[in-house]
Every structure is written in C-alpha cells, then in structure tokens.
C-alpha cells in the first residue's frame, strides 16, 4: 500500500476503502482483506470504541439452522414490521450471522456458558466484541485511520473511487484512492445524546446522495427509546420487565417497551411525567441482567436507586435511523448501491429486507451489521479486482455539495451550531416526528428545505469546522428524506405513525424509494411477494 506525504497531506491507495469502524465496517474490512484486497478503514472516532455498539451489550439474531426455529425467527417481527421483510434476505442474514458468531467464538470472543455448559451466542458485549474486531482487522493487514472523518467522496464517470477527509487530531487532510468504497457510517440520531451516537449524524447518507445513490424506507426513521431522564443508556429490551406509573403511583395503562411507547410519549407531551420500575423481572435473572449490561445500572447505582424496586422518571430519546430501518438502498446480494463501486452496510443501509418497518431492538440490527458488512466487503473486493489496472488511470473529482476554504472556522462553527439546533427542532419533538400529520410534515419540509439551501450556500473549512458543517448538512439531508417519504405513506405501518391515517392500508404494502439533494423525490417499489407465515 503506497503512502506519500505531499504538502502535509496523507495519500493512500487501496483496493477497498471502508468508511466507518463499527461492526458493519470492521466485518466489511475483514472480509475484503481475507479476499486478498488491500483495505483502508477510516473512522470518525476510534475504531473499536466509537459508535452505538462499542459501549453497549446487544442481543443478536442468532438462530440454529433448524427449520422450526428459523420459521419462528422469521415470523417474530414480520407483523410488527408491516409485512415488508423478505424471506430470501432473512435466510441469508440468519445463515451469515450463524457463521459469523461461530467464527467469533473460534477467534477468541469469550461467550458465556448457558445452563448446560454450551456457549451462549445470542448476545455480545460491545466493548469485548469491538476490541476483538479491531484486533482481527489489524491482523488481516487493514490500515486503520482513527479520528479521520470523511468530508467528500471522489468519483468519475465510472463510479466512486475514493474519498478525502481530515485527521482531527493532527489537522492534516487525507486522500484514499480505492477501487471500491463501502459506506458503513451508521445511522442518524441527530445528536440526541443517546449513548454512543455522538458520531452517528447521517454522514454516509449525505455522501451516498451526493454520489447519486438512492434510499429505501426513510419513513421508518422515528425510533425513540425509553431511558431514564438522568441517563443516556437506551437499553429498551430491559423495559419488557417494567411497569409504568404516574407520580401518584397509579399504573399507566397500555405503556410498554414494544407496543406502548406512544402512550408514554402522549403523557410526556401533556407535561405528565411517567415513571418506570423493572419490578416484573424475576428475582433469579436480576443478577444476569446486571452482568449483561453493566453500564445500564451505573447511573442508578450512583443515585442510590434500585431499578427493580424503586420508581424512576423516564423519557423517550430519539434514535432516528440508528434503531430505525430506513437507509441507503441496496440492489443485490453484495449490498451494492445503484452507483458503481459504492456499497452500503449496517445502519447506513436499509434494513427493511429483514425486518420491514420496525426492528424493535438490537438483535436484528446486530445481525444485519455483521452480515451486510460481510456481503459488502466481499462485493467491494470483487469489484476492485475486476477493475484491475483501470483504477490507476481514473481522473477522480469530488462530488460534494460543500465548498471548502482554509479560514474562518470560528464563524462557521457558530452558524453550524444554529443549523444543528434548527434540525433538532424539527425531528426531536414527539408531535412532529413520532406522531406525524400532513400539515406537520409539510411545515417541517418547508423549513428544512430553507435550511438546506442556506447550508448549500455556505463555505466551510478543511478542519473540525468543516466536519461539523458536514454533520449539519447530513442531518438536514436525512430529515428531508425522512419527512418527504413520510408524507407519501398515508397510513400507519411499522414505526411510521400518521395521526391523520391511523390504520394500516393493505394497498400500501410497497417500499418507498427516495433520493435527491436540492429536490427530494419519492417513488413506489414492489416488495418480494413471497409471504411469511406469522
């Protein structure tokens, strides 16, 4: 792998460039490297510690290859997802997840033992998992650039061929030329302060849109997670053991973690605080819950609260597309986009294929991350290999919508902060994003269009100010895709809720494809018709 320093710039050449160092990105890099590709992985943070998985424990959609178990797994969230998942994709992801989880065990992941002494592989501890993935990626010969966010993709008439960015700790810029690029930048939580999501600002969506990629299921993007008002840990699965109370101790009827979050939201909208207690958790599993998600309990311990006995105030924290299902549309089994040389994996890609319009938690997302990462890494490696010597003669240019300069950071950061706040004011309130209406969506779209136009006209810098500007632009672009597709889906399906169309409409059992930057477009697409028996 060539490395040349020119004018304080880092320049690298690779077969495959992976953008993002979470589970999807590391699996993509590892897979491409094992196929013989020279791989560079760039991470906005530190690969192995940044992102939503690294600080958390997560369930995994790990199911043994027994038909009855697989049938139950396919049906588990099919109805919740609005019947938009597809059997072939569910089967592929179940197979790949089974293979990858077993591989992790053989490579040193310390799976706990179940009651009969077998490794328990339906969950992963984020810190151990991502520490191992970084180690495996490095051992495979992948070059990792930490603290190196991407600012622009590079492309020519034949497709994407690299990217440029900045190393935020040193201030130097970097360029990677590559035969193929995998976007594994995660979803967008709009800087809501949910644990691990500070780097998840929709950057990959903006990069993909600028390159000409399209999106699917962006209406399924309004995930809100239950969490204590004093914590950033959004471990929604634990609230299956919760009872919800008003301040006077009476029960909040219908409130729950899977189907009852709307009831919590409506009370919070009315200024009525809701409290929770994990008092339904059986005594014998409480120690196990603590072991599985230690950081969930730390805020309680600091405040002297026993969450299994005491009542504590809760809120709903926006997780957007991180726990949503919409994302970059993929067009084949290798997770290719419609742009040659560009692949998408993990939360950056649509997850409708395996769970429709509702994930319900980490297990499907974790399975999708490792599986789609593997698929994309293999596809990108093959694309780069087929490109061969042609890669050396490409005249690549930036496809960014942003103009960069070398001075003016202070003023830029100030204006960027205002833009980020403006986006958050459109996507965070429950009565705009969770409970959607035609009038509300159109008002938000008008304001977001104006914000996008304003950001398009601004000049920014090749430094941290430029990174923040691109985050603001990415969040704005993401919100516009979300709300334009939400306006077109005039029904309630999956996590998408329309107050003015509260029922599911059988005639709308299709996907909504979207794209565009200055003008967002939407169109309908059929779902694979093979039905799942719930």
Which residue stretches match the model-derived regions?
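Extreme N-terminal leader/targeting segments of oxidoreductases
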Residues: 1-16, 34
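Conserved beta-strand-loop-beta-strand element in the redox core of flavoprotein oxidoreductases
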Residues: 154-174, 181
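Long, amphipathic alpha-helical stalk/connector segments used for oligomerization, subunit docking
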Residues: 383-465
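N-terminal Rossmann-like FAD-binding beta1-loop-alpha1 element of flavoenzymes
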Residues: 16-41
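Mobile, glycine/GP-rich and aromatic-enriched active-site lid/loop segments adjacent to catalytic centers
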Residues: 98-151, 219-360, 428-534
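Glycine-rich loop(s) and the adjacent beta-strand/alpha-helix scaffold that form part
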Residues: 180-233, 356-379
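Core beta-strand elements of the Rossmann-like FAD/NAD(P) dinucleotide-binding domain
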Residues: 11-14, 170-180, 338-339
């Amino acid at each position: 792998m060539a490395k040349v320093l020119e004018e304080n710039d880092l320049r690298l050449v690779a077969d495959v460039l992976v953008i993002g160092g979470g589970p999807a990105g590391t699996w993509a890099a590892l897979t491409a490297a094992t196929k013989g590709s020279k791989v560079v992985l760039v991470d906005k943070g530190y690969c192995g510690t940044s992102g939503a998985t690294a600080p958390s424990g997560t369930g995994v959609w790990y199911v043994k290859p027994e038909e009855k178990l697989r049938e139950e797994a396919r049906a588990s969230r099919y109805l919740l997802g609005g019947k938009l998942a597809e059997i072939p994709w569910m089967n592929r992801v179940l197979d790949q997840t089974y293979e990858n989880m077993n591989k992790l065990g053989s490579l040193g992941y310390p799976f706990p033992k179940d009651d009969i002494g077998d490794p328990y592989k339906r969950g992963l501890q984020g810190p151990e998992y991502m520490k191992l993935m970084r180690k495996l990626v490095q051992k495979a010969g992948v070059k990792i650039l930490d603290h190196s966010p991407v600012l622009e993709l590079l492309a020519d008439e034949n497709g994407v061929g690299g990217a440029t960015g900045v190393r935020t700790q040193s201030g130097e810029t970097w360029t990677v030329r590559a035969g193929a690029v995998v976007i594994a930048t995660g979803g967008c939580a709009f800087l809501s302060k949910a644990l691990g999501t500070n780097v998840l600002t929709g950057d990959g969506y903006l990069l993909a849109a600028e390159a000409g990629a399209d999106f699917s299921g962006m209406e399924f993007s309004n995930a809100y997670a239950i969490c204590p008002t004093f914590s950033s840990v959004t471990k929604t699965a634990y609230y299956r053991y919760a009872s919800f109370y008003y301040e006077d101790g009476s029960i909040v009827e219908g409130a729950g973690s899977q189907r009852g979050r709307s009831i919590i939201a409506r009370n919070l909208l009315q200024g009525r605080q809701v409290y929770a207690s994990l008092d339904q958790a059986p005594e014998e599993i409480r120690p196990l819950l603590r072991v599985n998600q230690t950081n969930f309990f730390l805020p309680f311990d600091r405040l002297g609260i026993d969450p299994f006995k005491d009542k504590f105030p809760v809120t709903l924290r926006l997780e957007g597309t991180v726990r949503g299902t919409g994302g970059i549309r993929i067009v084949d089994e290798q997770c290719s986009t419609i742009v040659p040389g560009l692949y998408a994996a993990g939360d950056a890609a649509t997850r409708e294929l395996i769970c429709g319009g509702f994930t319900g938690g980490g297990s499907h997302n974790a399975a999708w991350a490792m599986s789609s990462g593997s698929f994309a890494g293999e596809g990108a490696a093959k694309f780069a290999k087929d490109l061969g010597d042609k890669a050396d003669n490409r005249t690549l240019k930036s496809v960014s919508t942003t103009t960069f300069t070398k001075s003016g950071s202070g003023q830029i950061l100030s204006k960027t902060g205002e833009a980020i706040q403006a986006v958050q004011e459109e996507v965070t309130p429950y009565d705009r994003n969770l409970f959607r209406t035609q009038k509300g969506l159109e008002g938000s779209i008008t304001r977001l269009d104006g914000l996008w136009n304003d950001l398009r006209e601004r000049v920014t810098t090749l430094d941290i100010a430029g990174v923040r500007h691109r985050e603001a632009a990415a969040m704005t672009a993401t919100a516009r895709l979300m709300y334009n597709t939400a306006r077109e889906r005039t029904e309630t399906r999956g996590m998408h809720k329309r107050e003015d169309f509260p029922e599911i409409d059988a005639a709308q059992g299709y996907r909504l494809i979207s794209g565009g930057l200055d003008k967002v477009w939407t169109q309908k697409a059929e779902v694979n018709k093979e039905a799942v028996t719930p």
